[in-house]
């Protein structure tokens, strides 16, 4: 459980329902979220959006954009619940805000799984100093 908390802090600062996000990533990829994605590329972890290094890094870029588009939500404080049913993430909220947050987190976890072939261990701990700003809009 401690590893999931550390992962969440690294992956998104303190945004979102961090325990659930960590569980989703592990369930979809089988990877330890903290050590595999916590500081990956230019977009995973704290900081703004930068030019993605690869498809895995783009998952984090899109996730940050997803959070940015949330309405009437506080991704830092709000929490949500979800279920793992037949190897699929099911967001279980009726309230729009937690459901939207859950859908953002579900999308990044699935994106990581779909792009496991682009995952590069050399980008696991990337110094953000060498990341370029992007003109790409969310």
Swiss-Prot record:
The UniProt entry lists the main location of this chain as: secreted
Indicate where this protein resides in the cell.
Answer: Secreted
Keywords annotated in UniProt: Blood coagulation cascade inhibiting toxin, Disulfide bond, Hemostasis impairing toxin, Myotoxin, Secreted, Signal, Toxin
Q: Which InterPro entries match?
A: PLipase_A2, PLipase_A2_Asp_AS, PLipase_A2_dom, PLipase_A2_dom_sf, PLipase_A2_His_AS
Q: In which tissues is it expressed?
A: Expressed by the venom gland.
Q: Which domain of life is it from?
A: Eukaryota
Write down the position(s) of the site called Hydrophobic membrane-disruption site (MDiS).
Answer: 127, 130
Task: Name the segments for region: Important for membrane-damaging activities in eukaryotes and bacteria.
Answer: 121-133
Annotated site residues (Important residue of the cationic membrane-docking site (MDoS)) in this chain: 121, 124
What does the record list as GO biological process?
Answer: arachidonate secretion; lipid catabolic process; negative regulation of T cell proliferation; phospholipid metabolic process
Which cysteines share a disulfide bond?
42-131, 44-60, 59-111, 65-138, 66-104, 73-97, 91-102
Record Gene3D superfamilies: Phospholipase A2 domain
- Is Nucleotide-binding given among the entry's keywords? no
The yes or no answer to whether the keyword Magnesium is present is no
Q: Which SMART domains match?
A: PA2c (SM00085)
One example of the protein's molecular function in GO is: calcium-dependent phospholipase A2 activity
Transmembrane segments annotated in the record for this chain = none
Gene Ontology cellular component? extracellular region
Task: Give residue numbers for the site Cationic membrane-docking site (MDoS).
Answer: 128, 133
PROSITE patterns reported for this sequence? PA2_ASP, PA2_HIS
Which positions make up the signal peptide?
1-16
Q: Which family does it belong to?
A: Belongs to the phospholipase A2 family. Group II subfamily. K49 sub-subfamily.
- Stated role: Snake venom phospholipase A2 homolog that lacks catalytic activity. It shows myotoxic and weak anticoagulant activities and induces local edema a few hours after injection (5-10 ug) in the hind paw. A model of myotoxic mechanism has been proposed: an apo Lys49-PLA2 is activated by the entrance of a hydrophobic molecule (e.g. fatty acid) at the hydrophobic channel of the protein leading to a reorientation of a monomer.
Q: Which PANTHER family match?
A: PHOSPHOLIPASE A2 FAMILY MEMBER (PTHR11716), PHOSPHOLIPASE A2, MEMBRANE ASSOCIATED (PTHR11716:SF9)
In Swiss-Prot or TrEMBL terms, this protein is called Basic phospholipase A2 homolog Ts-K49c
Organism in which the protein naturally occurs:
Trimeresurus stejnegeri (Chinese green tree viper)
